[in-house]
Amino acid sequence: MAFYNNSFDSYQLFLNTEPFAYKAEINLFSAGVFAGRIVFHADGDTSISNQEFQPGGTTYKVPMLAYPLSRIGEIMDFLRYEKPLFISLDTVSNRAYLATKEREAVGEQEGV
């Protein structure tokens, strides 16, 4: 039972081909240290769920969030345009999300 609430400041995107189970994955980093992972499965595939993930060569775990591939565009926009960000996972309730770390001003893109 764990609760993760990890900040991150950079990411690395992979667009996979067969035979990978994930159609795409985004590894998240904080000051170069693995902080989380977002994976994308085929729409309708419910066999992949939010869970803990242990990066290779490490002794710690990070949150891994699973989304349908159809949401990759909105998540990439979120990563590109918002900061600071964090990834959160509660392994008891399985509640998981990406979020802005601070409040956003209303209408900040008005007039742009």
Short names for language-model regions:
Residues 43-77:
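Short, conserved turn/kink motifs that form compact alpha/beta structural patches or helix kinks used as
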Residues 8-17, 53-63, 106-112:
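Surface-exposed beta-loop interaction hotspot
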Residues 1-44:
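OB-fold ssDNA-binding interfaces and closely related basic DNA-contact patches used
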Residues 8-12, 19, 46-48, 80, ...:
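Low-complexity, compositionally biased segments
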Residues 66-112:
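Short, compact, well-ordered microdomains
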Residues 40-47, 102-105:
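A short, sequence-level motif marking secondary-structure junctions
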